[in-house]
Amino acid sequence: SPFGIWRPGVPNGISPKALDAYGSLYADARLWLASGWVDYLAPQLYWPIAQRELSFPVLLQWWRQQNDKNHHVFAALNDAAVGAKFSADEIARQIQIVRAQSSNGGEIHYHLRSVLENSALAAAVRAQYARPALVPAATWLDSTPPEKPKLTVAGEKNSIAIRWENGGMEPAQSWVLQVCRSNLWTTEILPAGQTGRTLEISRPDAVALRAVDRSGNLSPPTVLVPKKYSSAPDIKGGTKLMK
């Protein structure tokens, strides 16, 4: 997670008086990223959007443009400055800028304690992360998806018990469990050690499970549907994973 400015005055419009990470810290993070030497880079973009000479969106876009190997670039956000230098809404707007610039990006928050101890910041972050999301796959490490998991469902009148296991030799890093009720899919990301779940509210229309490997690749879904359906209902919200 290098300093957010590679060299003073780069790119155009950035302050020529900024810290020279290349010359003073001996950190050529641009070379690391362009050469593919790191799996992800999280430049410390710790300035507000409105500060033109240290512009958050301009610097984020510049770092993305150096990403010749198409590895991950995540924006490191300055949560610790909320309350002292800027508001919680600043962090929310920075998250929105990250998403607007790339559909395959993300953020790293510095640091978690700032979020946990600041109710306004916690609410702002929670509003942006309303649904679970997976870390994008590192396909340069491994692009082969895992085998689809084995899934069984035992149902009673008002609940069902779901059990699953790996479908192949490769252990899962996590699981993506999707449940459909009234044509709306909801998604949970579960730890590798969890191999079962009981749904007690009502019997769903369909259940789907995917394995996620250590590089972030998703397996094909294993889908179980009650006899009254010939196939899983179409998605009308909640997630796009089933498409």
Q: What does each model-identified segment do?
A:
Residues 2, 42-45, 77-79, 111-112, ...:
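Active-site proximal loops enriched in glycine and acidic residues that flank catalytic Cys/His/Asp
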Residues 52-59:
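Active-site-adjacent beta->alpha loops and helix N-cap segments on the catalytic face
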Residues 124-170, 216-243:
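Pro/Thr/Ser/Gly-rich low-complexity, intrinsically disordered linker/stalk tracts
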